[in-house]
């Protein structure tokens, strides 16, 4: 879904891919997100949005795929802020 700061693209794929009916778009989004993250083109947040997954689901997917984390200082600060807020509750 295109929104602020995003762009919609259309691609053609060959018929006969071994993907269950109705799963093609989801599978392509996940594969694209994984590869863009793996190559350092997309951040964790950008990649998980492309994949349509929560941060934690995307982290689990990265682990299953054997893709190491590219954890930036900014992401660490964000996670520490969340942890502090949760600890205060």
Curated annotation (Swiss-Prot):
Superkingdom of origin: Archaea
Pfam families: UPF0175
InterPro entries, A to Z: UPF0175, UPF0175_domain
Family membership noted in the UniProt record: Belongs to the UPF0175 family.
Name this protein carries in UniProt: UPF0175 protein APE_0276a
Annotated source species: Aeropyrum pernix (strain ATCC 700893 / DSM 11879 / JCM 9820 / NBRC 100138 / K1)
